[in-house]
A protein has these predicted regions:
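Expand to "…catalyze enediolate/carbanion chemistry for C-C bond making/breaking, isomerization
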Residues: 1-265
Length: 265
């Protein structure tokens, strides 16, 4: 089976940098994969992607060594199993609040006896090569999101759940959980303190920690802190920001940001 070099990096305490994809374009996915990211995450929760889009985008990504990851729309075993059968090497599960919900995510990612995943890997065997059924339980990354007040109360039980490979912070929903305004890359002291607490708890439990960013500044900050899975930006975000800046420069000679919109997606 083709190894999951991203999961190997996390297990070896090495960082990885990826990008978020919310535009339904296999060409965009292929382009960003060839840019050299460690992984690309296809967003079925907030992106405009359905299963057919995700399958085509993963096929495009497979022309490179970039690892395909999918954020499913919900903690639903059917959704998780379906994208794994299509070739995802990792699943990001949103809004996980407690140990029971973490176990639900894990068991959907694992074949028996470790889980309840139904056997029918379909395209996954074309991507992975021989040995998928035997090795998948050790190569598929299960990533659960920490982004609610309930999850913050249950960090230890979530992170100690066997089979959880990483936790991933959604900064905007985390801001809601802290009664703060969502603002993308967030410098509010309470937000910063909470992000650090989540990271340190993950380190204590020996699992990887990830976080969404929209800038080089915050990406470098989080890498320096010890995050293993850092999102540098998104297809939609890069396209919109650069287009806006170039247009403003052409019209006014001003290259500064023209919007307070900090949308990651």
């Amino acid at each position: 089976m083709r190894p999951n070099h991203v999961l190997q990096a996390w297990r070896a305490n090495r960082p990885t940098i990826g990008a978020w994809m919310s535009i339904d374009s296999s060409y965009t996915a292929e382009t960003l994969a060839h840019a050299g990211f460690d992984w690309l995450c296809l967003d079925m929760q907030h992106g405009v992607l359905d299963y057919s889009d995700v399958k085509k985008m993963m096929t495009a990504i497979s022309t490179t060594d970039t690892i395909p990851i999918v954020r499913v729309p919900w903690n639903e075993p059917y959704e998780i199993m379906k994208v794994l059968d299509a070739g995802a090497y990792g699943v990001v599960v949103p809004l996980v609040n407690n140990k029971e919900e973490a176990e639900r995510a894990v068991t959907a990612c694992r074949y028996p006896p470790l889980g309840i995943r139904s056997h029918g890997p379909n395209r996954a065997t074309l991507y992975s090569g021989p040995g998928y059924s035997k090795e998948a339980n050790n190569e598929i990354a299960c990533v659960v999101m920490i982004e609610t007040a309930e999850a913050l109360e249950n960090l230890d039980e979530i992170m100690s759940t066997p089979g959880v490979d990483a936790v991933y912070i959604g900064p905007n929903d985390l801001a809601y959980a802290l009664d703060l305004k969502p603002s993308g890359d967030n410098d509010n002291p309470l937000h910063v303190k909470t992000v650090t607490h989540i990271l340190e708890t993950a380190k204590k439990h020996g699992i990887a920690a990830g976080i969404q960013t929209g800038s080089v500044e915050f990406t470098r900050r989080y890498l320096a802190q010890g995050f293993h899975m850092v999102t540098l930006g998104s297809d939609r975000g890069w396209m919109e920001r650069l287009a806006r800046q170039e247009l403003k420069l052409a019209r006014e000679g001003d290259h500064t940001e023209s919007s307070d919109d900090k949308n990651f997606y």
